[in-house]
């Protein structure tokens, strides 16, 4: 009797433990399933918000910004709508229309490029649009051409002035060299004249010295012949 009571008690305890473990497993699986559903919904929501934000950034990059528009408000709203885990999208590259407007002034944007099909022609539509833009605003093109001509004229004027300066410097160098050669030639001529004068003076002095020697010799001979032999008679 006691053994049967113990056996029933053990069976009841094992059944209770199995039921409690199964209930805990079911609750944990339901919680995990709900958690996985919530995370997938959040991920899908973040993906949708990121794609909307990216398209909005592209539209803002292609549309011209007005003067009275406040870009800080839109940036702050986009920052609030942007999910936390997604990095900010890269800025769009500059299109050909912005380059054309920067070169030729404020012009209307060209129509978007269409996809080529089998019925499309061989010509390029972008060249036609640029020609239409130039034809619609010739004033900016004339101003740009005028500025180019002014730049060329300034370059030519600078080259001409540089050539004139070089030519004047060359003439001055030649004149200074000619003056130095003339001074040197005058100095050498003066020295040659001085040498010739000194040579003639030296020759004259030599002749005068010889004449003085001859005169002194003749005077000595006369003195010897005029000597008295006796003093007075008795």
From Swiss-Prot:
It is found in: Nucleus. One of its GO terms (cellular component) is nucleus. GO terms for biological process: positive regulation of DNA-templated transcription; regulation of photoperiodism, flowering. Gene3D superfamilies: 1.20.5.170. Residues 191-212 are annotated as: Leucine-zipper. Residues 163-213 form the bZIP domain. Disulfide bonds: none annotated. SUPFAM superfamilies: Leucine zipper domain (SSF57959). Keywords: DNA-binding, Nucleus, Phosphoprotein, Transcription, Transcription regulation. InterPro entries: bZIP, BZIP46-like, bZIP_sf. A motif (Nuclear localization signal) lies at residues 152-159. GO terms for molecular function: DNA binding; DNA-binding transcription factor activity. The modification Phosphothreonine is found at residue 231. Its main location: nucleus. The keyword DNA-binding applies. Residues 165-184 are annotated as: Basic motif. Phosphorylated. The keyword Transcription regulation applies. Transcription factor required for the transition to flowering promoted by FT. Belongs to the bZIP family. This is bZIP transcription factor 27. It comes from Arabidopsis thaliana (Mouse-ear cress). The gene is FDP.
